[in-house]
Amino acid sequence: MSNWSINDARTGYNVNYWSQGLYGISDEGEATVSPDPTRPECSIGLNELAKDMVKSGVNLPVLVRFPQILHHRVNSLCQAFNQAIQKYQYQADYLLVYPIKVNQQQTVVEEILASQVEKEVPQLGLEAGSKPELMAVLAMAQKASSVIICNGYKDIEYIRLALIGEKLGHKVYIVLEKLSELKTVLEESKKLGVTPRLGLRVRLAFQGKGKWQASGGEKSKFGLSASQVLTVIESLKSEEMLDSLQLLHFHLGSQIANIRDIRQGVSEAGRFYCELQKLGANVKCFDVGGGLAVDYDGTRSQSSSSMNYGLTEYANNIVSVLTDICNEYEQPMPRIISESGCYLTAHHAVLITDVIGTEAYKPEDIQPPAEDAPQLLHNMWHSWNEISGRADQRALIEIYHDCQSDLTEVHSLFALGQLSLTDRAWAEQVNLRVCHELQGVMSSKYRFHRPIIDELTEKLADKFFVNFSLFQSLPDAWGIDQVFPIMPLSGLDKAPERRAVMLDITCDSDGTIDQYVDGQGIETTLPVPAWSAESPYLIGFFLVGAYQEILGDMHNLFGDTNSAVIRLDDDGRTNIESVLAGDTVADVLRYVNLDAVSFMRTYEELVNKHIQEDERANILEELQLGLKGYTYLEDFS
């Protein structure tokens, strides 16, 4: 493609849309990051960054974090709500609460909190959904607003720890998820001499659409029904503690793609709020929960990997709907809280790793079948020879279908012992040749060709074997078909010569990425420069900062990857601030209660028994290094 330009690459990978200006492709065809969006001219080439890290001893794969992106996301979200509050003359403020379940890494939480250091009035709190998370936020929330929201199921210990948080100077909202929690909170608060701050999670009738819609609606796992809400009100009145009810919470589900769903949910919850006020409650906070989506594919659509709205529109809709309802009921306007973890963290992290090998189809010379060969083979040979002579575009479809049908029958006859292995191999090669040549003559300008072109593209795509575990680093791609943008880190200034699928190094056929972002939406293959064994070929997996680390598992005992924190200094220079080593083999063995020390003793016994004396020291050293080594492949970095 002689007229290829760098803008074609930017369009082909849709990077201008899913990246929101944080990632890009340089004029030299290198993938870049702009860690500090206030200085877009200070971009970092990811390919060179990865090579520098490898030279310094950091093996691939490596998860690269850009903390300045976290700061930018916090400030952007707060600014959007602050502007909406001013625009609609809303009579209360906004608080952003980070649910640490999205990414509990210390570096991430501390950087999110650090974004508020220079704020005169911090607009950031933390959310916990379990006892371990609560213990973490009790030690960190004072670095921002000291607001803590406690969600999830709660036992006595959880509730007491939350109440102790009040004694430590925090503002801890205990959100009632079940009716039975109220009694425990009231009893333990009296024992500790603490006035609790209570919240109610209401179960809305409306249910947002998407993969996580089950977390909202009448059948959701959490929340109180309308009648249960009234029971709580009566119980608090009887205890003369109605003033303790200070927060209303609801959750439509994560990754809400349609802004109309958000408007409708806020509208229903807003009426809950006003009705509670009419009953004498003094609710001060309106917590819209999560739902703010991330546009993973950059299509700005209602797909489950996208969103049909922007940040300003999101804030404006919530503020305007709540303003109108409060004015209608003549009730005071509550502080607005949102729990937007994915929006804050997804963009800040990139997984960088290397392609360790490929498998690609290359046309081979094929001899015609022998005269006495089975008729099926002659049919396939005839189909191949028919391609070049067919001017009728619809006839090409017939050739394709005939050849696929014949190949299926070949496989059946081979399984019955009626065809030889040589016959089968010949038929498979002819079929690939037919597919290859049809791919060259079919055209997407014919609508009836398009489905077959898609099939051929997928069938003939190269296989890229990539040094990572899908289950450890991109578990959502496997578990829920989540789409993540993927790009080669260099060579993008030239037209892509191949299309490929990415396969990980686990011994599992599910370790394959099935969906790829491109300029047309979601495809089953990715356009890529040709691979060469002569030089490193690096791939970036983008927007992996939300949930992926904590959800990742150790399939085949591939452990945590190396990680690094990268920051731009005041002069625009790139600083590798810290590197956290990934799991060693000994680490992952210990996680599954296998003892590397006892293994080493066993190795020594076996070496002494089976290895000649002059080799023993070297063999033992290799075994020891194996236990200390990285769980991923190291020879290719």
UniProtKB/Swiss-Prot annotation:
Q: Which reaction does it catalyse?
A: L-arginine + H(+) = agmatine + CO2
Task: Please state the pathway this protein functions in, per its UniProt record.
Answer: Amine and polyamine biosynthesis; agmatine biosynthesis; agmatine from L-arginine: step 1/1
Residues bearing the modification N6-(pyridoxal phosphate)lysine: 101
Q: An example of a Gene Ontology BP annotation on this entry?
A: spermidine biosynthetic process
> Which Pfam families does the UniProt entry name for this protein?
Arg_decarb_HB, Arg_decarbox_C, Orn_Arg_deC_N
Gene Ontology molecular function: any one: metal ion binding
Give the enzyme's EC designation: 4.1.1.19
* Functional summary from the UniProt entry: Catalyzes the biosynthesis of agmatine from arginine.
Q: What is this protein called?
A: Biosynthetic arginine decarboxylase
Q: From the UniProt record, report the name of the gene that encodes this protein.
A: speA
